[in-house]
UniProtKB/Swiss-Prot annotation:
The gene is hisA. GO terms for biological process: L-histidine biosynthetic process; L-tryptophan biosynthetic process. InterPro entries: Aldolase_TIM (IPR013785), His_biosynth (IPR006062), HisA_bact_arch (IPR006063), Isoase_HisA-like (IPR044524), Isoase_HisA-like_bact (IPR023016), RibuloseP-bd_barrel (IPR011060). Its EC number is 5.3.1.16. This is 1-(5-phosphoribosyl)-5-[(5-phosphoribosylamino)methylideneamino] imidazole-4-carboxamide isomerase.
Length: 242
């Protein structure tokens, strides 16, 4: 199982949200490039970045910092937040982003997902952010009537290979992930599932690994010191190729 440390960008700084609430944001680092380098030094093989300004506005806002991170760390980066059209996807892949996460755009524009997957295959991931099992969009400000499993199955039919699942009520809380929903999703589709939201310690990571989930995104638990990234990667990778 792969562990992806998370960087959430707002106005050029590293921040953490609580349950997706932009009013409950806290700056955890002034220099995201330094944070990314530290993640790499601690053994990260992949970094998860969200442009929170982009998620709200529908346009990538932190591109210069994201580009600097890619050039500096030289390990794969996946990016989500505000990616709403194929031109933006082309530009970001051209800038060196390894995997693009579509969230709101995937729900509002199935045609975009089809085009993007046809062109970039596994470089396209779908971010499914759920609240009470319903898919949320627009920086988590609006909740749709669509069930998260139904949506995941629809994306799989299109050809999507990677799904990032977040239970919003758990995100940034350090109260543990929604294991029940995660397991249900992982059993319902054959895509790679990446767990996100609420992971608080190494025990959570062990449980997620036992479910045969492809990856786990860890944010607040690293910044708060609950998880030592280097140790976690060693423990989770011990005796395992997945």
């Amino acid at each position: 199982m792969i562990i992806l440390p998370a960087i959430d960008l707002k106005e050029g700084k590293c921040i953490r949200l609580y349950q997706g609430d932009f009013k409950a944001s806290k700056v955890v680092a002034e220099d995201p490039i330094e944070v990314a380098l530290k993640f790499k030094e601690n053994g990260a093989e992949y970094i998860h970045i969200v442009d929170l300004d982009g998620a709200l506005t529908g346009e990538i806002k932190n591109l210069s910092i994201i580009s600097s991170i890619i050039k500096t760390i030289n390990i794969p980066v996946e990016l989500g937040g505000g990616i709403r059209n194929l031109n933006t996807i082309d530009m970001l892949i051209g800038a060196g982003i390894e995997r693009i996460i579509l969230g709101t755009a995937a729900l509002n524009n199935r045609g975009l997902v089809e085009e993007a997957v046809k062109k970039y295959d596994e470089k396209i991931a779908i971010g499914i952010d759920a609240k009470n099992e319903k898919v949320a969009i627009n920086g988590w400000l609006n909740v749709s009537s669509i069930n998260y499993i139904d949506f995941a199955k629809e994306m799989e039919k299109i050809g999507v290979r990677n799904i990032i699942f977040t239970d919003i009520s758990k995100d940034g809380t350090l109260k543990g992930p929604n294991l029940k929903q995660l397991e249900k999703l992982n059993e319902s589709i054959s895509c790679n599932v990446i767990a996100s939201g609420g992971i608080k310690d190494i025990e959570d990571l062990k449980v997620i690994k036992e479910m045969d989930v492809y990856g786990a995104i860890v944010g607040k638990a690293i910044y708060s010191g609950n998880i030592n990234l280097n140790e976690a990667i060693k423990i989770i990778n011990k005796g395992s190729s997945k």
